[in-house]
UniProtKB/Swiss-Prot annotation:
Keywords (A to Z) from UniProt: Antiviral defense, Cytoplasm, DNA-binding, Immunity, Innate immunity, Metal-binding, Phosphoprotein, Repeat, RNA-binding, Zinc, Zinc-finger
Biased composition (Basic and acidic residues): 26-38, 47-63, 91-109
Source organism phylogeny: Eukaryota, Metazoa, Chordata, Craniata, Vertebrata
Record gene name: Zcchc3
Name this polypeptide is given: Zinc finger CCHC domain-containing protein 3
Pfam families: RBD_ZCCHC3_1st, RBD_ZCCHC3_2nd, zf-CCHC
Residues bearing PTM Phosphotyrosine: Y198
Length: 400
């Protein structure tokens, strides 16, 4: 049956139709059966008036495909893209796929409206929406790398800070990375364990690396090995260790003419004057032969006048020992003065009681042990001496 609009329809098909601008019009109920009699151009015109210009700008590849002309499309009109139309609602007979983001947000809005007064339902809806919403590109983050909100902070190494600063003194452009300092210098060359280190901090662009240790013993170990390795291994070239945490940390050397002095007695004497951070070790020469020296890491104590230094010479029993470390002042063995040495000293000092003013043969005072520092006994009878402790153990074993 002729519709009366055939000529107009044919003329409209011959040239592309542009959507008309949207303008507000009153919605008029169309009588049933009128849509079947309208032509293609009239249908497009009515849709443009009711919906507005709902088409999105086509992408470059879509424009090219439309220009070439697809099969089944009217001449001069581009093939409609399903993405140009709004997503279908639930129950849509055409069965278009919906955006999961839109579904999640719709569910969240509906549940929020229905359960606004129920906090548990609202929280559950938020979790459901978050799980259904896909992550944006570039924002995917490994869960293991994201810090936990409730994780307690790491425990510090103690009240004090045990720091060294490793400085690179070469060309700035050749400054190694933090991984090199940690892996090559601290872990491999020094032989430290990762658990011994509290933190290694480098300010971006800086050539300084602050290393914090968990204890004074680990710091002393680092310093001792560093002194041995810095001249032997090329990895320490252009590196220097500065800014030690405490000026009272020292590497002490002790020497006796008698090599039979027990190292435990040396430690007992040292603990009277300083804090021993590591057990003394023997010093050997280039042939591997012991020189008679002991070396250990100590921390000097603070006194009323500042740092309390160790004497340069002392006695353990009848054996005379010598001590030295960097920064140790030279003092007179008799009176402790820094203005002269014992060879020119005119002061008398008793080595029996440790007081000045008289010599040992004329001493009438109570003897003082030069090992433990207590009165009433000499080194030979000192209960802290190794020879007495061993004798006591053997005596107790023989008695049973």
């Amino acid at each position: 049956m002729a519709t009366g609009g055939g000529a107009e329809e044919e003329s409209q098909r011959g040239r592309p139709q542009l959507p008309l601008p949207a303008r507000p019009v009153a919605r008029v109920e169309e009588p049933e059966g009128v849509r079947e009699k309208m032509g293609w151009a009239q249908v497009v015109k009515n849709l443009a008036e009711k919906k507005g210009d709902f088409r999105e700008p086509r992408r470059r590849d879509e424009t090219g495909s439309g220009a070439s002309g697809g099969l089944g499309s009217p001449g001069g009109l581009a093939t409609p893209n399903p993405g140009d139309f709004p997503p279908a609602a639930r129950g849509d007979p055409k069965g278009r796929r919906r955006d999961p983001t839109g579904e999640a947000s719709d569910a969240y809005r509906k549940k929020s409206a229905s359960g606004a007064g129920d906090p548990s339902r609202r929280k559950k809806a938020e979790v459901t929406a978050a799980m259904a919403t896909p992550a944006r590109p570039g924002t995917t983050e490994d869960a293991t790398e994201r810090p936990l909100q409730d994780e307690p902070p790491a425990a510090g190494p103690g009240k004090g800070r045990f720091l060294v600063r490793i400085c690179f003194q070469g060309d700035e452009s050749a400054c190694p990375t933090r991984d090199f300092v940690v892996g090559a210098l601290i872990l491999r060359s020094i032989g430290m364990d990762p658990d011994d280190i509290y933190a290694v901090i480098q300010i971006p662009g800086s050539r300084e690396f602050d290393v914090s240790f968990r204890s004074a013993e680990k710091l002393a170990l680092f310093l001792r090995v560093y002194e041995e390795k810095r001249e032997l291994e090329d990895c320490w070239e252009n590196f220097v260790v500065l800014g030690r945490s405490r000026s009272s940390l020292k590497t002490l050397f002790i020497l006796f003419r008698n090599e039979t002095v027990d190292v435990e007695d040396i430690v007992t004497w040292l603990k009277r004057h300083c804090d021993v951070l590591a057990v003394p070790v023997k010093v050997t020469d280039r042939f591997g032969i012991w020189t008679g020296e002991y070396k250990c890491e100590i921390e000097l104590r603070q006194g009323e006048g500042g740092v309390r230094h160790l004497p340069g010479a002392f006695f353990l029993g009848a054996e005379r020992g010598y001590s030295w470390y960097k920064g140790q002042p030279k003092t007179c063995f008799k009176c402790g003065s820094r203005t002269h040495m014992s060879g020119t000293c005119t002061q008398d000092r008793c080595f029996r009681c440790g007081e000045e003013g008289h010599l040992s043969p004329y001493c009438r005072k109570v003897i003082v042990c030069n090992l433990c520092g207590k009165r009433g006994h000499a080194f030979a009878q000192c209960p802290k001496a190794v020879h007495n402790s061993v004798t006591a153990q053997l005596t107790s074993v023989a008695g049973h």
